[in-house]
Amino acid sequence: MRISQLEGKAVALWGWGREGRAAYRALRARLPTQALTVFCNAEEAREIGALADAALQVETDASAQALGRFEIVVKSPGISPYRAEALAAAAQGTHFIGGTALWFAEHAQADGSVPGVVCITGTKGKSTTTALLAHVLRAAGHRTALVGNIGQPLLEVLAPQPPPAYWAVELSSYQTGDVGRSGARPQLALVLNLFPEHLDWHGDEARYVRDKLSLVTEGRPRIALLNAADPLLAGLQLPDSQVRWFNQPAGWHLRGEVVYRGEQAIFDTADVPLPGEHNRRNLCAVLAAVEALGLDAAALAPAAASFRPLPNRLQLLGSVDGISYVNDSISTTPHASLAALACFARRRVALLVGGHDRGLDWHDFAQQMAQQAPLEIVTMGANGPRIHALLAPLAEAGHFGLHAANDLEHAMGLARNALGEQGGVVLLSPGAPSFGAYSDYVARGRHFAQLAGFDPAAISAIDGLGVH
């Protein structure tokens, strides 16, 4: 559905975060007199009132009855379509659509194809991979957009001039379904990995996997690039797409610190500023994507050495009094915390874990701690007591020191004291979202930086967003 098709219809926007505001501006630019209603909270309603838009109404009760009055509801990604009020309104005939679907419909050609668009998703690593892809494409001299879930809503860059040659688009599991619903077919879709996350939004693991994979099952990209090492992807059948693989011996894969293409050694990653084996494997994905676009990936591989790592992702802030502080606030699953820990296997580490409780299973994490644990673990947040109880028997057996904190500031003090004069690494890799304590993971990362004695503003920006 294109924006022009909304004209004259009963249209509402649900959500007034950055995505919601981007949708409003895009609709208003194309449909200046279209009547619109925004569903938002009371504080946001006051902000909207200052816009002085006579064709804009505000409601704060997004009930099924209220939503059901509209033909089209443009929904912000963070609002689950599985909420009872959304399902009830849909049953009454309301059509829910996201800004991502509108953008793809605007850019699709007559046959549905969207040339130059690379969509990237995965449970973890998608932001770094998307940014790295944009970096490599720009190094090759191509004007490239870095947009999507990484921090720039697609509707904020609806029609940039001159248009980019390539679009590196990060999509969360909240957005992947929009691609198929738009009727568009991206040139390439890359799926990095899959393990449970956002179960509160999706409802259960099976639905999460289905929604995530809808990018390739319903979006029908011209080329689907998949991780051969992921068991949830390895058997996937996609008859409408050309399927390519990375992380397998015949293609782009990692041996030690060296990237190979088949049996040919291509690039030593020792100087690439991407900590962790998982990040080096994602470099293989980027090079496979570059190759799939018809470019010389082997020649472009060295460009990765000049990539600047993203904030809040295994970000080394610096050292104070013999203690290094690493900000991995983006970590919102136990698997992500394990991957972060693996980067510091030979260091004295105090790990800070815990946050909003989404009901994820921490038993695998606990089993790993029994085999290769950090020196100290500090639990915090709403799920902190649950994690603490799970780890307590291992701590009592002498595998690691275990501490319970009331909040991040308390956790920092406990971690410093536990490391003592010998120093080490304080690693914030919570394995849980920040909801309830912070507005988002960025705010949590900034607070961590501040508590560690660093300027939070100086470490928070993502380089290269938008079209360059």
From Swiss-Prot:
Biochemical pathway: Cell wall biogenesis; peptidoglycan biosynthesis
Localization in the cell: Cytoplasm
Enzyme Commission number, as recorded: 6.3.2.53
GO molecular function: ATP binding; tetrahydrofolylpolyglutamate synthase activity; UDP-N-acetylmuramoylalanine-D-glutamate ligase activity
Any Gene Ontology CC annotation: cytoplasm
UniProt keyword Cell wall biogenesis/degradation, yes or no: yes
InterPro entries: Folylpolyglutamate_synth_CS, Mur-like_cat_sf, Mur_ligase_C_dom_sf, Mur_ligase_cen, MurD, MurD2
Example GO BP: cell division
Alphabetic keyword roster: ATP-binding, Cell cycle, Cell division, Cell shape, Cell wall biogenesis/degradation, Cytoplasm, Ligase, Nucleotide-binding, Peptidoglycan synthesis
Binding-site residues, ATP: G122, T123, K124, G125, K126, S127, T128
Any Pfam family matching the protein: Mur_ligase_M
Keyword ATP-binding tagged: yes
Reaction catalyzed: UDP-N-acetyl-alpha-D-muramoyl-L-alanine + L-glutamate + ATP = UDP-N-acetyl-alpha-D-muramoyl-L-alanyl-L-glutamate + ADP + phosphate + H(+)
Top-level lineage group: Bacteria
Record-linked NCBIfam families: murD
Described purpose of this protein according to its UniProt entry: Cell wall formation. Catalyzes the addition of L-glutamate to the nucleotide precursor UDP-N-acetylmuramoyl-L-alanine.
Family matches, as HAMAP family: MurD, MurD2_subfam
Protein family per UniProt: Belongs to the MurCDEF family. MurD2 subfamily.
Name of protein: UDP-N-acetylmuramoyl-L-alanine--L-glutamate ligase
Organism: Xanthomonas axonopodis pv. citri (strain 306)
Originating gene: murD2
